Each structure stands twice: as structure tokens, then as C-alpha cells.
């Protein structure tokens, strides 16, 4: 049927009433730039209609025809839900004037639009496109402004055409804008000939997106472009699994599997990629293949570490006197290893302090701080996560912050781009703008990956002291590298390992029990037994370490619910949300995904007062405990005081940060999350894949955190996951109470299993190589003599 401004067609009984509208876009109320979901006001013969739907390319002032349904939204009232729409080219003077005056063309407002259309009438658009110099005939338009209007008008048309073209390949609005800005009109050629080029040039375009486009335009599976891009993608995927390089045989096998070609096809392209400096190949006992940015990042990290590593000649007796003074002031007695650590920071500019739980790392850090303060040195404390930084502040009494915040992460941060390029442009603090301090102390160093270490070192000047603290027996960082272990293994730095257990005091949160029970911390004791490969004590006679034998999944689930909801909150004097379930796996009946569904049902059941949002893998509900599962360096956060006023703000929420959903707003399509009871963050619905429920998390994700009470289900699972390091890391996350539920034999099997997956890194090798080069070349060699 022909379109009038508004009419409806009655459907069969029980179906929605289809309606047709035609009118001007008065203004855009809301738009989600990731998926194009838009709420707009449409002027239909002078009446305003609220229209919702996917309009990624629509601007104020445009004339559109729509087909859709009238619906009554429970919160926002009547609105028109678009099914299909069409942009109608302005075909009368009023339409042209309205479009030009809508703000769609920069520098043209309603008054100027009226003068332009009055002058050129129905020829207005033709003049702008074909004779733009004639715009200068209109009062208020210079020749320069005429050219600017024409360029803006043309770019608007070209961008819309490009974005609609790209949307046909499944590319969202935000990404389409990036592609258009990067390539302009050349994007059509690139899409048709080599869409894989976008993976090199544009953050957010990965191999899978490019590969889907390539299939649609008919590029074959054995294309050189495809294989080269696929090899780099395989190396980047390995990077996300923690590897800095891959052995050639594994790279060829993995890439061949991903691409559906043979390993020989992969190997044929490696030399070409090396010549183009995309990869670096090193021949040794095994042939190593690196993505070039990661190779140079590892080499530069090693060089910067060695450049910072300076030995000072100090009076040992003076340090001894200082230690004695600290002991007297603080009413403590340092163990010999703790004294050794304070001597170390007096003599060496890089010191590694390592040790398990309860070995006195915090006491030692405090002693170091007192020594540095006596020397008049400025000190900065930092940790990889907000939780770890908060614990560091509480333990030392000195302000600690995340490493990202110390390095002043900027709003343009893009880690994916930086990893591809091998730089750290996301931080304001760098070689050109270094940190102004004398000493940096980093805690939870096992979580620091190669990228973050490289960025930190770039922001340090020679003469700055670096103390790194961590437990080398925990799992390595989620990101690439194994920095702490590699630094220790290299033998190039002063390492002090604390091995005497001090934390045996009675934990104050527990009520007094039978005097016959051991008053020591069995969490600490058993953690050290696990590290040594010895059986743990499972007699349940302690106040903080419990084991409950259960033989099937349903029994384990029942006990988990009982412990978290009913038993432990009163025993440890915390809220159920402060009790953390840690599991080795993501999948399976006792994996993260299933456990979160179960615990959500019992800890935060449905309620008329709680709004919900369905997502691809379940739903979020107001009051849910959630975790950020990928780094987002651009997202903004605010801290508010009790009166609701903003007292601080910044950018960045990081992998592993936990919070509570405080609001779900269907109108703005945003979810509000409160992290660490301080930082408020709003997530567009399109970004909800960055969050997941966190009643249960993997042990790996828990690293760097500490919880009042931890519950761990250990029943059965693959040997590659159920190993000693994983168990040790999980046990050491518990501060006041740990309960393991499951099979005793599997627990003992984990203690004996030391076969954790190898991480392919060569930082230790680089440190040895560069240090040996420096020793072999004397001062004359350095001068080229």
C-alpha cells in the first residue's frame, strides 16, 4: 500500500497491530553505538511519536518511513517498535531545509538552512554536490565555508554508504566508523581484495571477523593473505594463553588446525613473515617463533631490568643499627631472613622478596619502608589489582594503588593495539614522562605479566629502586609471560625467600573452642604442606580448615549452598557475598558457569523489587555479585560520598574486579555496578559480555585476592587442571576459613600432581644472554674502541 503519514492494519486476532509511519527525525534521545539500538522522537504531521529500534546510521532531520508495531512499555509507556525502515530522500524544499538545519551538517543551523533553500529551492542538494562554490552567493557563507559545507555533506553521504555496506558483513556501527576513518573510499578495495589487512591496522578487527568477510567475498581458504593472518592470529591466541612464543612444530600444528590447511602450508609462509618482520624465529634446542612485537618487548624488558640493577656500597654496620632501631620502635624482632631482606634493599636497587603465606612478607615490607624513609627516599606502593592494592594499604598504613593507576592510564587506552604494536601507549607515564619517585614496591608480583612489567620499567629512570614481592609458587599471570619466576630463575637479581612461618596466631573471629584443639592457622600450615607435596591434615580439629567428604555432584552442590547461605556467614561473621566459591574449572556440573546459576537461585532469587536483564548465557539481576572478565581501559568510574556527590573519578576496570549490580535501567539500556563498595560503573547493554556472575570464580581468576572464607569443590576433573599449584593458589586465597568439599583421593592426587602446563617464555634466557654480553664487552667496547 502507498504510505500516508500514519495508518494501521489490523492483523488476525491475537496478533500485534501493524502500523506504518512517515515523518522527520526530530531528535535522537539515546543510541547504543555498539549495536545501533536507538530511541528517537519522530515528528509525524506535527505530533511526536517515540520510536525504538536499530537505527545505526540515522541523523536528526532525516525523513523516514517505517513499518512496525505499537507497544506499551511497562516503564516508558506507549512507543512504536520498528520492524523495517527506509530513509526517504528529501523531495521538497521543507524537507531539505529541515535536514540541513538539523545539525547533520556542521556549521549549518536552521537560519542558514532556510537562506540556502530559499536561494536554490529544489536545486539545493544538486548545488551542494556539483556547484558548491555557488553556496557563497548566500549571505553568511564565505567561499571557505562553502567548500567546508560541501565536504561535510559529501562525507556524510559517503560514510552512510560505507557503514551500510559494512553492516552487510556483520560489522557493528563503532567498528564501521573506525574502518571508514582508517581507509576512506579505499575500504571497498580492501574488503574485496584483502580484508585481513584490517587485523593489522584496526583494533577490534580480529582474524575471525576478517575471515568471515573473506568467505563472503570469495577469498579461498589457501589464500596467502589468509594463512599469514592466521599464523599471526595463532600467535596472538597463544599470547592470551600466557605464551610469549610457540615452538615451531606447535605453531604449525595449531595454525593448520585453525585454518583447515596442512602444517606444511604454514611452514612455507614463515620465512616470508620473518623477512617482513612480522615474526622472529630463533634456532636453539627447539625452534622458537615469536610475534615480532612480543620478541622485542621481552628483550627490552630484560635490558631495562639489567640497566636498573645497581649495587650500592653501604656500611653493613649502619644498616644493622637501623634495623635495631626499627625493632625497638615497632616492638618487634626480625627473623634472620627478614633482616637479610632489609640489608638487600640497602645494597641493591632491584630486590625480589618471595615467600608463602604467613612467612612475614608484610612485616618485612614495613621494615623496608621504615629504612627507606630514614634514608629520605620517596616511596610508591602498587599492586596489579584494586583488591591487592587495598590489602597492601591496610597492611602497611601507606597508600597503595593499582599499577595501572600509578602509571596514569589514559582515556585512549587500547591494550589489543599495544600488544600488536609492542608498545605501551595507553599510559601517560613512560620514558618521556617518568615516575618521580625513588622507590617502587610492587606486591602480588606473580600476577604481573610481561606487558605490564614492560610498561612499568619504561616509566622508571636509572637510580630508581624496585622491590618486587610475591609468592613464586602461585599460578603465573593471566597475561603473557612468567615474570616473577623468570627473574628468580635468571640468577641476576638479589632474591630473599622467607621460609619461616609466623602466622600461627588464633584468628580473632572465632568463638573459643575446646582447649585441646590446635590454636594455629591450619590454612597456613596446610598450604605449606601442599607446596612441599605432603598430605594435609583433614581431621577437622582446627578452627579454620575443614574437609567434607562428598561422593557425588548433587551432594556437593547441596553442601555448597548450605555453607555459603546458612553456616559460614555466622561462623566467620560476614555476609554471604563475602564468601567465595573457588573451582578449578569453567565447564561441568561443578564449574563456574553451573555453580553461578545454582548460587544465584539461592543467594539472590527473583523478586518483584529486583529488575532483571536477560543475556546470552543466562540473566543478571539487581543484587547479583559479578566480576569483570576482560580489561576495559576506557570505561569511566565515579566514587561518591554518602550524599551522592562525586569525590573522585577515573577510567579503567580490570579483569578480576568484583562488584554488585545496583541498578538495571531498561530505558538507558545500562547496568550499574558498584566495585569494592566504592567505584560506580555504568555498562551499556552491548558491553555486558565483559561481566559474569561471580558467586563462583575459577581459582586462576581469584589470584591476588583474599576472602574471609573460601569454599572449594574438588570432586573430579582433568589432570591437566587439577595440579598442585592450582590447589596451593586456591588454599592461600582464604584468610579466616577454608572448606574443601569433595573427594579425599582427588585432593591428595592434586597434591602429588606437579605437571602444570608449561608456559613458553624466555625472559630468564634473555637476562642471562644480555648480562653475559655486558660482562664480555669492557668499557672500551661500549665506546666502540
List the model feature ranges, each with a label.
Residues 167, 236-237, 281-340, 412-413:
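Pre-P-loop entry segment of helicase/translocase ATPase cores
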Residues 647-650, 655-785:
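C-terminal accessory regions
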Residues 2-14, 27, 413-433, 762-785:
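Acidic, low-complexity intrinsically disordered tails
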Residues 30-42, 667-673:
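Short aromatic-glycine-enriched beta-strand elements
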Residues 17-32, 68, 658-662:
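Structural detector for short beta-strands of small beta-barrel domains
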Residues 473-651:
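Conserved helicase motor core of P-loop NTPases
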Residues 37-45, 50-51, 59-287, 343, ...:
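Accessory alpha-helical DNA-binding modules that contact the DNA backbone or grooves
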Residues 339-342, 347-540:
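ASCE P-loop NTPase helicase motor core
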Amino acid at each position: 500500500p502507498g504510505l500516508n503519514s500514519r495508518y494501521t492494519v489490523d492483523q488476525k486476532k491475537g496478533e500485534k497491530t501493524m502500523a506504518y509511519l512517515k515523518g522527520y527525525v526530530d531528535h535522537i534521545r539515546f543510541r547504543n553505538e555498539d549495536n545501533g539500538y536507538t530511541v528517537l522522537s519522530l515528528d509525524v504531521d506535527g505530533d511526536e511519536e517515540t520510536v525504538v529500534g536499530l537505527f545505526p546510521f540515522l541523523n536528526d532531520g532525516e525523513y523516514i518511513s517505517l513499518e512496525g508495531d505499537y507497544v506499551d512499555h511497562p516503564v516508558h509507556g506507549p512507543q512504536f517498535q520498528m520492524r523495517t525502515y527506509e530513509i526517504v530522500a528529501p523531495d521538497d524544499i521543507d524537507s531539505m531545509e529541515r535536514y540541513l538545519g538539523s545539525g547533520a551538517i556542521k556549521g549549518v543551523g536552521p537560519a542558514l538552512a532556510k537562506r540556502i533553500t530559499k536561494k536554490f529551492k529544489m536545486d539545493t542538494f544538486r548545488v551542494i554536490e556539483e556547484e558548491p562554490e555557488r553556496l557563497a552567493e548566500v549571505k553568511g557563507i564565505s567561499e571557505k565555508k562553502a567548500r567546508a559545507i560541501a565536504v561535510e555533506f559529501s562525507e556524510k553521504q559517503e560514510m552512510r554508504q560505507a557503514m551500510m555496506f559494512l553492516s552487510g558483513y556483520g560489522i557493528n556501527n563503532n567498528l564501521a566508523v573506525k574502518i571508514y576513518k582508517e581507509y576512506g573510499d579505499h575500504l571497498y578495495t580492501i574488503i574485496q581484495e584483502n580484508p585481513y589487512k584490517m587485523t593489522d591496522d584496526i583494533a577490534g578487527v580480529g582474524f575471525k571477523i576478517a575471515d568471515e568477510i573473506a568467505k563472503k567475498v570469495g577469498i579461498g581458504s589457501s589464500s596467502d593473505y589468509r594463512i599469514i593472518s592466521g599464523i599471526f592470529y595463532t600467535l596472538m591466541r597463544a599470547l592470551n594463553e600466557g605464551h610469549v612464543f610457540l615452538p615451531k612444530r606447535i605453531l604449525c600444528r595449531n595454525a593448520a588446525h585453525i585454518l583447515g590447511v596442512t602444517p606444511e602450508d604454514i611452514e612455507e609462509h614463515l620465512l616470508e613473515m620473518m623477512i617482513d618482520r612480522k615474526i622472529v624465529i630463533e634456532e636453539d634446542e627447539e625452534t622458537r617463533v615469536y610475534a615480532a612485537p612480543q620478541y622485542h618487548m621481552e628483550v627490552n624488558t630484560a635490558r631495562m631490568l639489567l640497566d636498573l640493577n645497581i649495587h650500592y656500597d653501604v656500611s653493613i654496620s649502619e644498616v644493622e643499627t637501623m634495623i635495631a632501631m626499627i625493632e625497638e620502635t615497632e616492638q618487634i624482632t626480625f627473623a634472620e631472613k627478614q633482616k637479610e631482606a632489609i640489608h638487600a634493599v640497602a645494597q641493591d636497587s632491584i630486590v625480589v622478596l618471595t615467600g608463602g603465606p604467613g612467612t612475614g612478607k608484610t612485616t618485612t615490607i614495613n621494615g623496608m619502608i621504615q629504612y627507606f624513609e630514614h634514608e629520605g627516599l620517596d616511596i610508591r606502593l602498587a599492586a596489579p589489582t584494586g583488591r591487592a592494592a587495598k590489602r597492601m594499604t591496610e597492611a602497611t598504613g601507606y597508600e597503595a594503588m593499582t599499577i595501572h593507576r600509578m602509571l596514569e592510564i589514559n582515556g585512549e587506552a587500547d591494550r589489543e593495539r599495544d600488544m600488536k604494536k609492542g608498545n605501551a601507549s595507553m599510559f601517560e607515564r613512560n620514558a618521556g614522562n617518568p615516575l618521580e619517585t625513588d622507590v617502587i614496591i610492587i606486591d602480588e608480583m606473580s600476577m604481573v605479566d610481561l606487558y605490564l612489567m614492560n610498561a612499568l620499567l619504561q616509566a622508571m629512570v636509572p637510580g630508581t629502586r624496585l622491590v618486587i614481592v610475591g609468592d613464586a609458587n602461585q599460578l603465573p599471570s593471566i597475561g603473557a609471560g612468567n615474570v616473577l619466576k623468570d627473574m628468580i630463575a635468571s640468577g641476576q637479581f638479589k632474591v630473599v625467600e622467607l621460609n619461616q612461618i609466623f602466622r600461627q596466631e588464633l584468628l580473632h573471629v572465632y568463638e573459643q573452642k575446646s582447649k585441646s584443639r590446635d590454636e594455629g592457622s591450619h590454612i597456613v600450615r596446610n598450604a605449606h604442606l601442599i607446596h612441599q607435596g605432603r598430605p594435609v591434615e583433614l581431621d577437622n580439629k582446627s578452627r579454620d580448615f575443614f574437609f567434607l567428604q562428598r561422593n557425588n555432584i548433587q551432594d556437593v552442590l547441596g553442601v555448597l549452598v548450605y555453607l555459603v547461605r546458612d553456616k559460614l556467614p555466622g561462623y566467620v561473621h560476614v555476609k554471604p557475598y563475602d564468601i567465595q566459591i573457588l573451582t578449578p574449572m569453567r565447564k561441568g556440573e561443578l564449574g563456574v558457569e553451573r555453580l553461578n546459576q545454582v548460587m544465584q537461585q539461592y543467594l539472590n532469587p527473583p523478586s518483584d523489587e529486583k529488575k532483571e536483564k536477560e543475556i546470552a548465557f543466562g540473566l543478571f539481576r539487581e543484587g547479583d555479585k559479578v566480576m569483570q572478565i576482560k580489561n576495559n581501559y576506557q570505561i569511566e568510574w565515579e566514587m561518591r560520598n554518602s550524599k551522592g556527590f562525586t569525590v573522585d573519578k577515573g577510567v579503567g576496570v580490570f579483569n578480576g574486579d568484583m562488584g554488585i549490580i545496583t541498578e538495571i535501567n531498561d530505558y538507558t539500556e545500562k547496568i550499574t555496578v558498584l566495585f569494592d563498595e566504592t567505584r560506580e560503573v555504568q555498562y551499556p547493554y552491548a558491553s555486558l559480555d565483559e561481566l559474569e556472575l561471580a558467586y563462583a570464580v575459577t581459582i586462576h581468576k581469584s589470584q591476588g585476592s583474599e576472602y574471609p572464607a573460601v569454599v572449594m569443590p574438588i570432586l573430579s576433573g582433568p589432570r591437566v587442571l587439577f595440579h598442585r599449584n592450582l590447589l596451593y593458589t586456591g588454599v592461600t586465597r582464604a584468610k579466616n576459613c577454608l572448606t574443601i568439599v569433595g573427594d579425599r583421593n582427588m585432593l591428595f592426587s592434586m597434591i602429588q600432581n606437579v605437571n602444570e602446563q608449561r608456559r613458553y617464555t624466555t625472559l630468564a634466557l634473555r637476562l642471562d644472554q644480555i648480562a653475559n654480553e655486558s660482562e664480555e664487552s669492557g668499557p672500551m667496547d661500549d665506546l666502540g674502541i
